[in-house]
Amino acid sequence: RVTISLSPLVPKPGTPFQWHPMEEVKSLKKKFSRVRKALGKLPHLKMSFGSPHEAYLQTYLSRGDRSVHEFFKTYLSNGHDAKSALAKHSVDLFVYRQYGKEDYLPWDIVDHGYRNGFLWDDYQRGLMAGRTPVCDTATCHVCGIC
């Protein structure tokens, strides 16, 4: 028996993909549907898919700025209905925005201990399906953490 699990990319601060937008929910649903159709009838295959809507919410909460507190106020006052709270607030900017290298990121006020230049280079490698060399903490100080 083989299990395939697919989940949407949730770009998060402090990672090389912090500059990357989340893929549109509609597009993710179509892709997951195509995979289901292509592989769904294979014997001994189990598939699971992460929720694009949950990924959207996670992306907003991780990439949002101070205005996220308004979302939470709405969410807490409406019976914990995330869908209607998201609809009330303009959050697409935080979810679908492609940031550039020189853009100010809402989470830049937090000192993560690394240099953004290192993460940017790693992001560029990732876009090209490149690999990041193994870190030898005894000799390497590229990221700025060690």
Regions found by a protein language model. Give the residues of each.
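Generic structural "secondary-structure junction" signal
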Residues: 11-12, 19, 107-112
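Radical SAM enzyme core and accessory elements
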Residues: 32-146
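Residue-level recognition of the N-termini of beta-strands and the immediately preceding loop/turn
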Residues: 1-3, 45
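Short helix/loop capping segments that flank catalytic or ligand/cofactor-binding pockets
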Residues: 14-15, 118
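Short secondary-structure boundary/capping segments
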Residues: 17-27, 61-68
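Generic secondary-structure boundary/loop-capping signal
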Residues: 6-7, 14, 102-107
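Active-site-proximal loop/turn and secondary-structure-junction residues that shape catalytic pockets
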Residues: 6-12, 51-55
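Long C-terminal interaction/binding lobes of large macromolecular proteins
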Residues: 11, 26-28, 33
